[in-house]
Amino acid sequence: RVLFRSDLSWADSVGSRQMPGNHVILSANSFGAVADSTVLSTEAIQKAIDSCAVSGGGTVVLQPGYYQTGALFIKSGVNLQLDKGVTLLASPSIHHYPEFRSRIAGIEMTWPAAVINIVNEKNASVSGEGTLDCRGKVFWDKYWEMRKEYEAKGLRWIVDYDCKRVRGILIERSSD
């Protein structure tokens, strides 16, 4: 039984080929992000990302702590750096994830955004030794409850599309 393959030559052909340039380093904390797991910091972190993109690209950082967030959209030329000690906690509210057209299980449909999204962007990245805690239990509990109801009606597979759940990371139609 092989637990780890030492041949990782394939790794060179996946992922970001280059990191965004570090023209600017912005702290999302200076935009109002609060290292308090009970405070929603989505707007502040997104403002830092957007400002970094408008400045020509660079890196967005956070001070160590726990940050509750909804959907974040990484822009071209921006690196969201989650250093050790930084934890992004996904909001348990589906309302913090705007819906848009995406591909789910091979089908184009409207679906909630992920916690971290890179869509139609170039040279965007997420790096660091920090943590993304998607806290998906609330969404999966809903799914399993709905699945019981659907199975009783012979509609097992429909629940997969009716019970919208937040994804952790979405990278779609992006390059470098």
Predicted regions and their residues:
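Extracellular/periplasmic carbohydrate-active domains that bind, remodel
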Residues: 4-176
